[in-house]
């Protein structure tokens, strides 16, 4: 099974857009998706969004949330890095 890891998946909108493109590709519709972020709240939100995206396009990925970056990266075939610039006062 192909494993795609999103580092910084708390960037929900960016994650949603990239995930949608990935899951629309037939070879990835049943892959393992690992969402990793250090922020629990944002990670849970991204997980809900990812599940809704998958359901809406008829994909059936295995979606895993993980705070530990090393675990998230273990065995990954593809890694997508996301981060938000700014946000600090």
Which ranges hold each PLM region?
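Metallocofactor- and cofactor-centric catalytic cores in central/energy metabolism, strongly enriched
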Residues: 1-89
């Amino acid at each position: 099974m192909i494993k795609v890891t999103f580092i910084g998946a708390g960037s929900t909108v960016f994650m949603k857009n990239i995930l949608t493109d990935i899951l629309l590709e037939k070879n990835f519709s049943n892959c393992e998706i690992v969402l990793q972020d250090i922020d629990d709240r944002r990670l849970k939100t991204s997980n809900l969004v990812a599940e809704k995206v998958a359901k809406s396009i008829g994909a059936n990925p295995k979606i895993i949330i993980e705070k530990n970056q090393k675990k998230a990266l273990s065995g990954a075939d593809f890694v997508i890095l996301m981060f938000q610039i700014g946000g600090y006062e």
